[in-house]
Every structure is written in C-alpha cells, then in structure tokens.
Amino acid sequence: MASSGVTRRDPLANKVAIVTASTDGIGLAIARRLAQDGAHVVISSRKQQNVDRAVAALQAEGLSVTGTVCHVGKAEDRERLVATALNLHGGIDILVSNAAVNPFFGKLMDVTEEVWDKILDINVKAMALMTKAVVPEMEKRGGGSVVIVASIAAFNPFSGLGPYNVSKTALVGLTKNLALELAAQNIRVNCLAPGLIKTSFSKALWEDKAQEENIIQKLRIRRLGKPEECAGIVSFLCSEDASYITGETVVVAGGAPSRL
C-alpha cells in the first residue's frame, strides 16, 4: 500500500519512557528524540550533576523530561527510577536500557574475575533486572516496548575488548529470550546495535586519528556515526509503527560487517 504522504506527529504522545545512562552520548540523544516525539521521559545517570545538567538542557528545549540518579547495578536505584516514573506520570510504557561499562583493554586471558563480574553485572544482568522491574507496570498499561542497547561488537568484536564484546553478544540473546517470554503480555523487546558512534564512551577508539581513519576505511559510509542517528531508530521501535516487530536487532553502523 502506498504511503498517504501525511506525516504523523508525536507518535509517542503521552507515553512514559525510562532511559538509563541518558545524560550524554547515545542515551541523551535517545531521551531527547523520545521526548520530541511526545513521550514523558525520565532520564538517569550515576551522578546527580549529570542528571541536573541534562534535565535543564532538555527542559529548556520545551521537552517533558525529568530525571533521577540511578546506578543500574543497585536494586534500590532501579526501584527508585521506576518509582520516579510512577509518581510523576502514573505508569511506564517504554524502557530503553543503555547503561554499560568497559573497564578493561587487553587479552581475554588476562581478564580477572573481578572485571568479568563488573562487566557482566552491569552490561547484562542489570539489563535483565531493569526489565523485570518495569514489566509489571507495562502489564497494567496493556503492554509496552523495551529496547536494549547492545553494540556491533556483538557480531564483529573489537580487538582488546573481549569481555565487553561478549557482554554485548549476550544482549542479543537476552533480547530474543525476553521477546519470546513477554509477547503474551503485549510487550515487545528489541535491540539496537550501534557501530562506532562518536561519543565520550567510545573516545578510546577514535581519538587517535590514524586509528579512526583505519576504522572508517572498513565502513560503507565513510565516517563515524552521530548519536542522533541511533535515536530515531529507537523511537520507531517504541512506536505503533513497529507493532509487529519483536526480538530483532537493528544495526546502525555505517555498513560495517554485522553478522555472526
């Protein structure tokens, strides 16, 4: 069927969205786009000053955004984040799980148990537990949408980032399993896998110009991505336009190889 050519505004009107790790980079861009598309957004970060700065900036743009401190690895922080959304807006329709850490660079055989625990706790376990925390609230609303932020490293691992790569591959599996289990509750679960997006989190991979150029030469689109180029995809996945999509991973990586 051909498009009518009519642009629909505010596809997320009056939806309530939680976005973790959303005061900078990809998370901030996602929070901004969801709010621009009509959602009431609750952002979070581990540091209060970062939350305050991001909330002030987004509210200055006329967007419905509030925020709270949340370390996703702490149960009490996850509970507070959910409670903030409920107290302010009465429910939760959307969760975007973006939090991740990467405290290690080197060979897999040199990774300590402590590093493995930290990466898997934050990058994988906390994602599952954050979803668990919001599902009962989504059920009360008749359904919802979860977007898990992984990485192209799930398919095409970065050298020296073994534990991080493994954690992101695990998120693709988590997405598929959550989608399978939550479909009956009308909760869709999808995954975003960004390539090398120019953010402070990925700075170690692009601050050296020679290294950046080497990466760019492997891309079909010969440049690094921008956070905003991830945000629209997430908004789409959370909207009714994606109502028949679940368990999928969308790669936003400039054409970099991205299959297992």
From Swiss-Prot:
The modification Phosphoserine is found at residue 202. Detected in liver and kidney. Detected at lower levels in heart, lung, spleen, small intestine, testis, brain and stomach. It catalyses: a secondary alcohol + NADP(+) = a ketone + NADPH + H(+); 3alpha-hydroxy-5beta-pregnan-20-one + NADP(+) = 5beta-pregnan-3,20-dione + NADPH + H(+); 5beta-dihydrotestosterone + NADPH + H(+) = 5beta-androstane-3alpha,17beta-diol + NADP(+); all-trans-retinol + NADP(+) = all-trans-retinal + NADPH + H(+). NADP(+) binds at residues 18-42, 168. It holds the Pfam family adh_short_C2. Its EC number is 1.1.1.184, 1.1.1.300. One of its GO terms (biological process) is retinal metabolic process. Keywords: Acetylation, NADP, Oxidoreductase, Peroxisome, Phosphoprotein. GO terms for cellular component: mitochondrion; peroxisome. The record marks 158, 161 as: Responsible for the stereoselective reduction of 3-ketosteroids into 3alpha-hydroxysteroids and benzil into S-benzoin. Substrate binds at residue 151. Gene3D superfamilies: NAD(P)-binding Rossmann-like Domain. Inhibited by flavonoids (kaempferol, quercetin, quercitrin, genistein), myristic acid, pyrazole, barbital, phenobarbital and CuSO4. It is found in: Peroxisome. SUPFAM superfamilies: NAD(P)-binding Rossmann-fold domains. Primate DHRS4s display different stereoselectivity and catalytic efficiency in the oxidoreduction of some substrates as compared to other mammal DHRS4s due to a difference in conserved amino acid residues. This is Dehydrogenase/reductase SDR family member 4. The gene is DHRS4.
